[in-house]
Swiss-Prot record:
It comes from Lactobacillus johnsonii (strain CNCM I-12250 / La1 / NCC 533). Disulfide bonds: none annotated. Gene3D superfamilies: Ribosomal protein S8. Keywords: Ribonucleoprotein, Ribosomal protein. InterPro entries: Ribosomal_bS21, Ribosomal_bS21_CS, Ribosomal_bS21_sf. GO terms for biological process: translation. One of its GO terms (cellular component) is ribonucleoprotein complex. Pfam families: Ribosomal_S21. The keyword Transmembrane helix does not apply. The keyword Ribonucleoprotein applies. This is Small ribosomal subunit protein bS21. GO terms for molecular function: structural constituent of ribosome. The lineage of its organism: Bacteria, Bacillati, Bacillota, Bacilli, Lactobacillales.
Amino acid sequence: MAKTIVHENESIDDALRRFKRSVSRSGTLQEYRKREFYEKPSVKRKLKSEAARKRRHY
């Protein structure tokens, strides 16, 4: 869990920006989106193979 302590004389906008950056670096939102809905194993395999195909194709 990302935590951000608001320092003295720091604006809320700056603290929010630091919080958003820490959340994106930790990968919390990506993990949430990945687990939001159940994916059958066959669908996971299909998506994984499509991603590999995209990486190979310049």
